[in-house]
């Protein structure tokens, strides 16, 4: 081929052929395999790097040879299967690696051990070379991969499957690996040579300082390599459990081993092993994909378990059904018992015959490798999936996804659904019969033959179908028209058939009664005795309840229907034990007959099956596991049973049972031989969950832990692991730094420091109170912080491995040391010291205190037990030691204490008379708290010594102390001060001498003046000093808030300055007058001024300066406050402006850019561009608009997720905003994909506003030539899946919030239909009611399921008009051509458009879809449409369609009254209205509490909620309102109107029925209503027959016409139940049903009582264990630990009284049930029938010839009374066209039509249909060129191109392949939404 291309001269073709050749691909894959570097390279590198010399060269060669040989063996193992099986199993690693590693470890570390005994050097050298060779060979076979993973090596295996010339591929891939390996080794050598020759590395100072670094590295390299190898292998082997340590399961029944190569019975359930040693991550998954377990599927070790059951002395085989519904620990396991005809209770036990096998022979039968190593994880599975049908788990069968050649469409093709057993059988035949010659027909001949046979069969079926449809058109609708199904005959002579429920031909392999049990994990341990299991037995729904969970026993199934269903089930009547014994089987049968006769009827007739049917010889082999695993809870529940396992094997969440009270009842019979009961005691325990990650959930003990991939734990304590891919989805940012918050915090701290320095005398009382409050808050915060720290410490002790054992041992040791060693030795030492100090010893007092100390053992939570009793499992669960009346050593004991001091000491001791012991022997107030300061022994001694020393110091040393003070004062004066004083003294003395010499007469006067001046000076000095001292008080900056205080202070300063000023003026005047003496003449010459006058002048000058300085000082003091205030304000303003400017600049830039982008985006529309530019180009006035923005933000609730609002609600809010604001959404609304998701009315409204392009209003689908199946899939994107299912698929939680549409009321939204404001369009919505589905029969269940499949196929018709793709029934042509819509409510009423959301109910949710409350994270409740809390069991209304066949456009209703016409007597086509419950007469309802957005309309249009008898009738409207709109109405509002008398209308319409629990006055009113109703119904019939035009009151009339079908059902049930148990009041009955049916609430204590109640319980537990509890009780009451006010002294307190008193509070339990993938797959098909996110308004386009309207009306008229026979199978009257054919013929006809034999791709394309497809959003016009018959044709097709998932999706339905892969159904809805242009 290559040569031919070369000769042709086509270089491109030549290159492509070379690239795609096997050799090149092998080289490529081999080269890639080089990069899967493993530990084997360590040996190779070690030999090449370290070895030197001649021996080193040989070792290098041997290492390289061994390495290449090992890799060659790995490549050969790909081609050679036995070698691959030998090397690709985990036991190979275990067998080879562990001994070899041990040997290699000793070899490297103890070489001298092997050197002894060696004779010659040569032999050892050769041995070492051989060891090097073996090292590299063996380690290459170990298949370890470090970098990056083994995936590159597995690519070879993938291509090997596709390659034809496999040997050439293996050779070329090995050559490619060899080339890559040589490149890698050369690269390593180059790096080493570069390191050796690099001077910068060699000249490094660290390397130069150590001369022998290289030699030391060489010497220790061997040890380094051995350590690396050891760590690597331990890392890989650490995930593999040792086969010796693991425990074999205890088998419940032995198994038969058949066939070749059958190995061990104890093998795993699910295998996560993959080739090449790595394991698939399965630990966190809840469902395992069967496609991953391809190796398990062909397991030769399968166990075909056949349990033999003896009934009436005959051996019967169990009939187990291969229908898996996996629940993880959610289903309880019960025993099965069967009854013989003699009803003998002794013979009713289940007898399992075990094959007796000698274990000794069994040992030799099994191979050694299998005994030691199970190649699928030994004897332990990873998860244990329990089947709900059977006791033991059913093994997964072989996957149907098996590739093999088969004939398809007349040609040989590879089928991926080929049965593997068939292909294996064919290969065996080909090997055995080698002489058999197979004649292969040519492909054309095969194809022609297939075409011929297909056309023949298609014509026959079409002819038959046409004949039957003609019969239907001739108004002869009889049951004979329908093709009969093949039924299983029970009795050939009498021709009795099995009931439909048990007919294997009708129900397939999944027949039988499926029980459903609530999750036992979530239930509280305290209420386990009151736990009620609900069983669905036949058609009895929520009637039979178990009353005592603890006393479950083997009971007898007396139902007639157990002929084929022998599965394990819940016993119906585990009655509590009475004095006479348990109820006998005859009594049970009588009670069962009552229920059986009242309720169970056959689907077609009213005849009751009463004759018992024996167990027949019908059996199927179901491979199941021989062992039964249980978890911890199941083990505790089944401890009284005989067959319980010794220990639980399934790991559950880590729990600790906190023991509270043990009741030891020793009142046993002394003569009884059974002494085991003496040790048994009733224990009351709390369950405490460990606060740690629950990564071990449901893992089997000893199983291999799968390696977690793509998970990172970033924090020290992290609750959940996070993948790095989804770190951006975490709401909390990793790093957050609030700059403004930090600045505020610093400023507050600084201001607080400044203000605390100011001490003002007149501090107000209000400030004191505020400070006290602040201190209390700080204390509270500190307490919370300490509590949090304590919890963290406790959790840390709980997390660390073996930490509790170490801590407990230390605590016990510390307690012993403290009590018996430390304190006795301290007492002895103290008293000896007292004797030596000649004082009396205090032995008796100390020993009394020592004996008073009690060491009470407590649980980990602090619940007190006793001194000697240790908590259960205290080494693992933890322990606390509480010390009561702790002993403190005292230096002396006071003989007499004053009474006041005694009381004070007693109060102090009561506060500190207990503590907890820490690990270090310290004392703490609370467990894990901080250690408290202990009393010191020497402190009182030192205190007494100090007192005595003070007394001694007082008298003799007083004089010395005074002298010391004087000396210090004198010494403190500075030298300069001394000098200045001395100078002034000498100067004054000189002046006096001079004056006395010159003028002795003036001496007296001058002395007088001097004295006067001195005295004045002294006065001035005193005044001035006082003034300065007063004025120099440091006045600190005051708080800005203390304005009154600052004003008062300023006033004081003003007064002070004024007085100082007056005093200064006085002094100056006195000084001037002092020198004027009239008696003495002083002759002073005019030329000379005497010296004293100069001195006085200078002193006066200085004094004036001082005065000026004083004024300045006073002014500064006065203005300091305003100055500081101005300074701080300036700082604040600068900081604020800085903070504001930065976001303002960025936001301005952002808005500028955004406006440019918007302008660029909508450049086509000039007007829009101008408007947006005007609105968006304004600069931001940040500060001025600040208040407005804050007010806007405060109006919104930040917690509300916008995604939880519906589309209608969002547009309703947009409509209420200003007109200009809508332009902000213009670019969103003008996006070309938006038009598909907007309602037409909203589009019209936006078009009138000018913000929606008219050309975007209706988009065309251009892909009309695409395959029809693909186009259909595009219309069904991921929003279709039900909300409950999407919550199970975690990544799509937001889709549920998107789909939760709300009720919206908008006045003028629809302007297009403004002329039709008075028109009321009746559209019914589909009701969500999961629980009620259980009451329907199994036949209806199966019928609905198959209808869902049929209609699912019909949806592919008219695929390109998505409106018409949702017409899943055959609509009728009505008289007035009225529009019909399904699943959605649109009510046009007085200009209002109310979009009532239509719920989507999955068809087969009935058996196991309890609402998963825990998954609804964004809501606090369940949707109100799902449950109705009423006693009357309403019939399941899956879906109904109201067709007002006689409706008139002129029908009007008043807008004041809610008159909804949604219950019509006419029946729908496909989903009939099974029952019509009585509705509330809304027209008479006057008072409403609130009506938010017409919410009550939907409430009133629902079926009745039985308001007259409900749990709390006051809450009915409030409850419904709240659970619908939780974000609007706070939860507190539900309790505000508790005592308000809500006037609820009791006028509930009924027909010929009475409620069981109605009072007499209500019954009379109902009778009157029934009379009125008959008159109204007759009027309605007249109106309908005459088709009158004037029907103004049609709404109110029809609302009164509703019937309550389920009432008979409920009343009959209630009568029987009241016979069983009499109740005191209606409330008790309601509470009973409310609790027992729904089990969705729990009672908890009030929050305020929680802590006090726990404290009381702790004290009770201690007092119950004490012999004399009086002292402890009194001390605990004094300490306040035991609260007397919450002690319940009244004995007979009921739950109601407790709830009235507020002690108990009702709150919901979050139930969680995991459904298997099979259910989700069915849902993904069924749910596609409905489309919740978009309303479908469908026009009628099929005509009368399809199904005659008259015939339908007649058929409806024949069955007007649905109440007479509730289980009447009306689905036989539903005209899906294929209904006339049987299921198999129907399926065959579809496939024949799909195979258009002359089309190449096998898909039928109708040119007429494809060319006339209408646009999206338009109704189908009935035009003339459309032929009606062609529209009616069935255009089904099967095989899509290039989509494996689609094929497997439809494969489950077309071919009844029930074991399909779970992933295929879901993936269809997980595709991203395709943009349809």
UniProtKB/Swiss-Prot annotation:
Its main location: plastid. Keywords: Chloroplast, Membrane, Plastid, Plastid inner membrane, Protein transport, Transmembrane, Transmembrane helix, Transport. The chain crosses the membrane at residues 18-38, 67-87, 90-110, 127-147, 175-195, 224-244. Residues 249-258, 299-308 have a biased composition (Basic and acidic residues). One of its GO terms (biological process) is protein transport. The keyword DNA-binding does not apply. It is found in: Plastid, Chloroplast inner membrane. InterPro entries: TIC214. Residues 249-308 are annotated as: Disordered. GO terms for cellular component: chloroplast inner membrane. It is a multi-pass membrane protein. Residues 259-271, 284-298 have a biased composition (Acidic residues). It comes from the Eukaryota. Involved in protein precursor import into chloroplasts. May be part of an intermediate translocation complex acting as a protein-conducting channel at the inner envelope. Part of the Tic complex. Belongs to the TIC214 family. This is Protein TIC 214. It comes from Eucalyptus globulus subsp. globulus (Tasmanian blue gum). The gene is TIC214.
């Amino acid at each position: 081929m290559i040569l031919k291309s070369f000769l042709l001269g086509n270089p491109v073709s030549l290159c492509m052929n070379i690239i795609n050749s096997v050799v090149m691909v092998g080289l490529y894959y081999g080269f890639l395999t080089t990069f899967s570097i493993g530990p084997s390279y360590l040996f190779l590198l070690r030999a090449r790097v370290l070895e030197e010399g001649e021996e080193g060269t040989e070792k290098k060669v041997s290492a390289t040879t061994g390495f290449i040989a090992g890799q060659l063996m790995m490549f050969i193992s790909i081609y050679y299967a036995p070698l691959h099986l030998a090397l690709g199993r985990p036991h190979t690693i275990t067998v080879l690696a562990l001994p070899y590693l041990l040997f290699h470890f000793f070899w490297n570390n103890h070489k001298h051990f092997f050197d002894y005994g060696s004779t010659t050097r040569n032999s050892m050298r050769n041995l070492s070379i051989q060891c090097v060779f073996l090292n590299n060979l063996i380690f290459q076979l170990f298949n370890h991969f470090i970098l990056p993973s083994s995936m590159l090596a597995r690519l070879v295996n993938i291509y090997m499957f596709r390659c034809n010339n496999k040997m050439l591929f293996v050779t070329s891939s090995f050559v490619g690996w060899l080339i890559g390996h040589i490149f890698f080794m050369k690269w390593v050598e180059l790096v080493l040579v570069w390191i050796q020759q690099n001077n910068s590395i060699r000249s490094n100072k660290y390397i130069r300082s150590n001369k022998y670094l290289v030699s030391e590295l060489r010497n220790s390299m061997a040890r380094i390599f051995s350590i690396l190898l050891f760590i690597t292998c331990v890392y890989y082997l650490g995930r593999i459990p040792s086969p010796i340590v693991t425990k074999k399961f205890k088998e419940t029944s032995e198994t038969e081993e058949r066939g070749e190569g059958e190995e061990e019975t104890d093998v795993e359930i699910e295998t996560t092993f993959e080739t090449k040693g790595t394991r698939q991550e399965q630990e966190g998954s809840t469902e395992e994909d069967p496609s991953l377990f391809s190796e398990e599927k062909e397991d030769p070790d399968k166990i075909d378990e056949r349990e033999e059951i003896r009934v009436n002395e005959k051996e019967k085989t169990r009939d187990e059904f291969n229908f898996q519904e996996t629940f993880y620990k959610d289903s309880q396991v019960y025993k099965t018992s069967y009854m013989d005809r003699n009803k003998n209770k002794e013979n009713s036990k289940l007898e399992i015959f075990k094959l007796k096998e000698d274990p000794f022979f069994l040992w030799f039968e099994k191979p050694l490798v299998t005994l030691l190593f199970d190649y699928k994880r030994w004897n332990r599975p990873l998860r244990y999936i329990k089947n709900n049908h059977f006791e033991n788990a059913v093994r997964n069968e072989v996957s149907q996804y098996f590739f093999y050649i088969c004939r398809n469409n007349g040609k040989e093709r590879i089928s991926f659904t080929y049965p593997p057993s068939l292909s294996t059988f064919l290969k065996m035949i080909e090997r055995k019969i080698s002489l058999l010659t197979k004649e292969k027909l040519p492909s054309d001949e095969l194809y022609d033959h297939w075409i011929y046979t297909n056309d023949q069969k298609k014509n026959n079926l079409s002819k038959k179908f046409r004949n039957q449809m003609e019969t239907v058109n001739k108004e002869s609708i009889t049951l004979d028209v329908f093709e009969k199904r093949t039924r299983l005959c029970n009795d050939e002579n009498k021709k009795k058939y099995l009931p439909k429920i048990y007919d294997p031909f009708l129900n397939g392999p999944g027949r039988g009664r499926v029980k459903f049990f609530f999750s036992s994990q979530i239930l509280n341990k305290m209420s386990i005795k009151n736990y009620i299991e609900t069983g669905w037995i036949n058609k009895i729904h929520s009637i039979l309840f178990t009353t005592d969970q603890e006393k479950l026993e083997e009971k007898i199934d007396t139902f007639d229907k157990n002929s084929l269903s022998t599965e394990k089930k819940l016993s119906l009547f585990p009655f509590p034990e009475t004095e006479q014994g348990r109820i006998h089987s005859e009594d049970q049968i009588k009670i069962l007959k009552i229920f059986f006769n009242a309720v169970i009827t056959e689907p077609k007739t009213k005849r009751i099956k009463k004759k018992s049917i024996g167990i027949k010889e019908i059996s199927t082999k179901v491979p199941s596991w021989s062992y039964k695993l249980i978890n911890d809870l199941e083990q505790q529940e089944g401890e009284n049973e005989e067959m319980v396992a010794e220990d639980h094997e399934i790991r559950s969440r880590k729990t600790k049972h906190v023991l509270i009270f043990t009741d030891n009842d020793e009142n046993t019979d002394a003569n009884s031989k059974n002494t085991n009961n003496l040790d048994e005691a009733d224990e009351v325990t709390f369950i405490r969950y460990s606060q740690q990650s629950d990564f071990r959930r449901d893992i089997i003990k000893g199983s291999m832990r799968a390696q977690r991939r793509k998970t990172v734990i970033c924090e020290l304590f992290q609750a959940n692991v996070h993948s790095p891919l989804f770190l951006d989805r975490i709401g909390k940012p990793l790093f957050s730094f609030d700059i403004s918050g930090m600045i505020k915090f610093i400023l507050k701290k600084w201001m607080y420091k400044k203000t605390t320095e100011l001490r003002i005398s007149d501090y107000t009382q209000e400030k004191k109170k505020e400070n006290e409050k602040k201190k209390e808050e700080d204390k509270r915060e500190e307490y919370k912080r300490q509590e949090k720290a304590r919890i963290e410490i406790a959790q840390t002790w709980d997390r660390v491995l073996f930490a509790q054992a170490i801590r407990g041992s230390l605590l016990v040791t510390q307690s012993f040391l403290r009590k018996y060693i430390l304190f006795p030795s301290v007492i002895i030492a103290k008293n000896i010291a007292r004797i030596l100090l000649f004082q009396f010893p205090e032995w008796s007092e100390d020993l009394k205190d020592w004996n008073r100390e009690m060491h009470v053992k407590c649980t980990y939570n602090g619940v007190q037990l006793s001194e000697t009793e240790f908590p259960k499992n205290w080494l693992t669960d933890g322990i606390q030691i509480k010390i009561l009346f702790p002993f403190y050593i005292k230096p002396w004991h006071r003989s007499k204490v004053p009474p006041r001091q005694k009381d004070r000491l007693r109060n102090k001791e009561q506060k500190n008379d207990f503590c907890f012991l820490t690990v270090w022997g310290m004392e703490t107030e609370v467990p894990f708290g901080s250690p408290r300061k202990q009393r010191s022994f020497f402190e009182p001694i030192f205190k007494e010594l100090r007192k005595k020393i003070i007394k001694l110091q007082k008298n003799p040393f007083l004089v010395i102390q005074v002298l010391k003070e004087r000396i210090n004062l004198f010494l403190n004066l500075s030298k300069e001060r001394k000098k200045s004083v001395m100078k002034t003294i000498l100067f004054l003395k000189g002046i006096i001498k001079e004056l006395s010499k010159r003028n002795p007469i003036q001496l007296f006067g001058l002395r007088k003046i001097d004295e006067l001046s001195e005295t004045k000076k002294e006065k001035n000095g005193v005044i001035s000093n006082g003034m300065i001292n007063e004025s120099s008080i440091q006045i600190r900056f005051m708080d800005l808030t203390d304005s009154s205080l600052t004003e008062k202070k300023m006033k004081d300063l003003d007064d002070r300055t004024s007085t100082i000023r007056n005093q200064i003026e006085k002094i100056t005047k006195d000084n001037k007058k002092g020198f004027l003496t009239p008696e003495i003449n002083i002759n002073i010459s005019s030329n000379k001024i005497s010296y004293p006058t100069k001195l006085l002048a200078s002193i006066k000058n200085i004094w004036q300066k001082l005065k000026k300085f004083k004024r300045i000082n006073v002014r500064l003091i006065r203005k300091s406050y305003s100055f500081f205030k101005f300074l701080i304000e300036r700082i604040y303003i600068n900081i604020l402006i800085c903070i504001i400017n930065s976001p303002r600049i960025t936001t301005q830039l952002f808005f500028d850019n955004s406006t440019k982008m918007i302008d660029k985006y909508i450049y086509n529309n000039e007007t829009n561009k101008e408007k947006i530019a005007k609105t968006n180009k304004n600069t931001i006035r940040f500060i001025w608009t600040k208040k407005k923005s804050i007010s806007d933000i405060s109006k919104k609730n930040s917690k509300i997720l916008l995604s939880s609002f519906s589309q209608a609600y969002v547009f309703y809010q947009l409509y209420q905003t200003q007109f200009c604001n809508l332009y902000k959404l213009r670019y969103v609304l003008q996006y070309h994909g938006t038009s598909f998701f907007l309602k037409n009315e909203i589009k019209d409204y936006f078009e009138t506003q000018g913000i929606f392009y008219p050309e975007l209003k209706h988009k065309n689908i251009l892909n009309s030539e695409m395959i029809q199946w693909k186009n259909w899939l595009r219309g069904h994107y991921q929003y279709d899946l039900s909300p409950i299912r999407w919550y199970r698929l975690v990544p799509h939680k937001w889709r549920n919030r998107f789909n939760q549409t709300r009720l919206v009321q908008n006045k003028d939204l629809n302007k297009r239909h403004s002329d039709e404001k008075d028109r009321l369009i009746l559209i019914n919505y589909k009701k969500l009611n999961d629980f009620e589905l259980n009451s329907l029969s199994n036949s209806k269940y199966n019928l609905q399921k198959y209808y869902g499949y049929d209609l699912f196929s019909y949806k592919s018709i008219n695929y390109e008009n998505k409106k018409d793709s949702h017409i899943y029934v055959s609509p009728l042509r009505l008289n007035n051509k009225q529009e019909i819509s399904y699943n959605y409510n649109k009510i046009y009423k007085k200009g209002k458009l109310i979009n009532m959301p239509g719920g989507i109910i999955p068809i087969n949710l009935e058996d196991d879809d309890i609402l998963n409350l825990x998954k609804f994270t964004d809501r606090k409740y369940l949707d109100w449409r799902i449950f109705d809390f009423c006693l009357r069991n309403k019939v399941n209304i899956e879906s109904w369609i109201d067709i007002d066949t006689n409706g008139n456009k002129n029908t009007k209703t008043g807008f004041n009254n809610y008159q909804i016409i949604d219950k019509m007597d006419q029946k729908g086509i496909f989903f009939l209205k099974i029952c019509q419950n009585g509705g509330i007469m809304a027209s008479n309802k006057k008072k409403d509490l609130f009506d938010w957005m017409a919410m009550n309309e939907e409430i009133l249009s629902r079926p009745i909620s039985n308001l007259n008898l409900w749990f709390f009738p006051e809450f009915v409207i409030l409850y419904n309102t709240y659970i619908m709109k939780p974000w609007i109405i706070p939860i507190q509002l539900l309790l505000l109107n508790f005592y308000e008398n809500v006037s609820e209308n009791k006028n509930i319409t009924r027909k010929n029925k009475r409620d069981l629990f109605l009072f007499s006055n209500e019954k009379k009113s109902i009778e009157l209503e029934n009379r009125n109703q008959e008159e109204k119904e007759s009027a309605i019939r007249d109106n309908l027959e005459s088709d009158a035009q004037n029907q103004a009151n049609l709404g109110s009339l029809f609302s009164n016409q509703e019937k309550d079908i389920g009432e008979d059902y409920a009343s009959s049930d209630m009568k029987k139940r009241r016979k069983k148990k009499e109740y005191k009041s209606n409330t008790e009955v309601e509470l009973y049903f409310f609790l027992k049916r729904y089990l969705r609430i729990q009672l908890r204590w009030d929050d305020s009582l929680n802590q006090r109640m726990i404290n009381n319980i702790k004290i009770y537990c201690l007092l119950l264990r004490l012999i004399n509890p009086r002292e402890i009780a009194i001390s605990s009451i004094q300490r306040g630990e035991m609260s007397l006010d919450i002690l319940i002294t009244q004995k007979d307190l009921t739950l109601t009284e407790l709830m009235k008193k507020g002690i108990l509070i009702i709150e919901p339990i979050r139930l969680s049930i995991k459904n298997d993938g099979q259910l989700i797959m069915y849902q993904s098909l069924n749910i596609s029938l409905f489309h919740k996110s978009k309303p479908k308004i469908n026009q009628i386009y099929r005509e009368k010839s399809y199904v005659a309207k008259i015939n339908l009306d007649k058929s409806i008229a024949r069955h007007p009374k649905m109440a007479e026979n509730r289980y009447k199978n009306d689905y036989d009257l539903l005209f899906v066209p294929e209904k006339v054919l049987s299921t198999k013929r129907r399926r065959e006809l579809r496939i024949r039509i799909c195979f258009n034999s002359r089309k190449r791709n096998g898909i039928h394309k109708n040119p007429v249909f494809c060319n006339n497809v209408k646009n999206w959003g338009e109704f189908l016009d009935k035009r003339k060129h459309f032929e009606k018959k062609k529209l009616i044709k069935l255009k089904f097709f099967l095989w899509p191109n290039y989509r494996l998932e689609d094929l497997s999706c439809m494969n489950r339905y077309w071919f009844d392949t029930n074991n399909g892969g779970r992933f295929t159904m879901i993936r269809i809805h997980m595709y991203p939404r395709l943009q349809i242009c």
